[in-house]
Amino acid sequence: MGKSCKVVVCGQGSVGKTAVLEQLLYANHVVGSETMETLEDIYIGSVETDRGTREQVRFYDTRGLRDGQEFPRHYFTFADGFVLVYSIDSRESFKRVEALKKEIDRCRDKKEVTIVVVGNKLDLQDQRRVDSSAAQQWARQEKVRLWEISVTDRRTLIEPFVHLASKMTQPQSKSTFPLSRNKNKTSGSLDS
């Protein structure tokens, strides 16, 4: 296990950010239980990667954003990854995720950062307001992975977080530059 990765979990209020983390890390979500507004919590978990290694991840569970509220800038500077959460029964929450993605790109100056998007409340299909294929098309265009999940089915939570941990802790790729010196001792000139 290497360094601890820092992941910021963000989205509109009441989309289930805390419930996702509680269920993922502790299998501790009771459907219908009373919810409380989160100010900020930090969860530390060990997530297995697709390489079979376990990585420590520090999840920053952020306050749900309300209309007109900006996302605090300090989160953009230290995060190794982001989980953007929306609820499939709320078009506004998906629009908030679209805006957050733009904000991350702008604040990080398009620097490499791992982002996954999760559409929560898959169990509320009859109340769906976000078209699944349109959301997937947006995700492909933005070059992020998107999963639809439900905290009522813990198995749906595993793949997005394994992907996240795997991408953030990917071994550095090998250099394409040759390591040995050129055996032909010609001058360094580029002229033919």
Curated annotation (Swiss-Prot):
GO terms classed as biological process: negative regulation of canonical NF-kappaB signal transduction; Ral protein signal transduction
Motif (Effector region): 35-43
Ranges where the record places region Disordered: 169-192
Keywords of this entry: Cytoplasm, GTP-binding, Nucleotide-binding
Annotated SUPFAM superfamilies: P-loop containing nucleoside triphosphate hydrolases
Residues that span the membrane, as ranges: none
NCBIfam families per UniProt: small_GTP
Family the entry assigns: Belongs to the small GTPase superfamily. Ras family. KappaB-Ras subfamily.
The name this protein goes by in its record: NF-kappa-B inhibitor-interacting Ras-like protein 2
Taxonomic source organism: Danio rerio
The organism's taxonomic lineage, starting at the top: Eukaryota, Metazoa, Chordata, Craniata, Vertebrata
UniProt gene name: nkiras2
